[in-house]
Structure formats: C-alpha cells, structure tokens
C-alpha cells in the first residue's frame, strides 16, 4: 500500500466562527456530524452519538470551531 492509503488528511474548522462550506466539508467526513437548525445565514453543527446530542455550536459563535473540533476529535465517527 502507498503511504497515502495509511493516512487521511482531515479538514477541521477554524477556532472561531466557520462558514457553511467549511461545515459541509467537515460533516462530509463523519457519520455523526450534521448541519441542523438551518436558518439560511446561520446554522448549527452538531455531533451526535447513537442519536443523543453530544455537542452543538452555532456557526457564528466566537469559539465555535475550537469546541467543535474537540468534540469531533473525541466522538466523531469517520465515514
């Protein structure tokens, strides 16, 4: 196998607010990360485990990406 087959480079979120494009890229990598409460200009990125809410952040919050990255690291299930 090639080295690239052993390692996957995953896209994370910036520490602060994040864009829809960034959220979609992250959610596409995980089976349990979703965009919810979509209001058009703002939305929540959510981590769930067996349907139970683990963490959620509005995309415009100051430290939204920082906390989402931590919970995704600990609870995210790669596709």
Swiss-Prot record:
InterPro entries: DUF905, YkfF-like_sf
One Pfam family here: DUF905
UniProt entry keywords in alphabetical sequence: Plasmid
Source species, domain of life: Bacteria
Disulfide bond keyword on record: no
Source organism phylogeny: Bacteria, Pseudomonadati, Pseudomonadota, Gammaproteobacteria, Enterobacterales
Family of the protein in this entry: Belongs to the UPF0401 family.
Coiled coil: none
Name of the molecule in the record: UPF0401 protein YubL
């Amino acid at each position: 196998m090639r080295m690239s087959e052993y390692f996957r480079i995953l896209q994370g979120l910036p520490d602060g607010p994040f864009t829809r494009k960034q959220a979609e890229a992250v959610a596409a990598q995980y089976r349990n990360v979703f965009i919810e409460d979509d209001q058009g200009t703002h939305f929540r990125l959510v981590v769930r485990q067996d349907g139970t809410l683990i963490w959620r952040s509005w995309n415009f919050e100051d430290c939204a990406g920082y906390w989402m990255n931590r919970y995704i690291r600990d609870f995210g299930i790669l596709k």
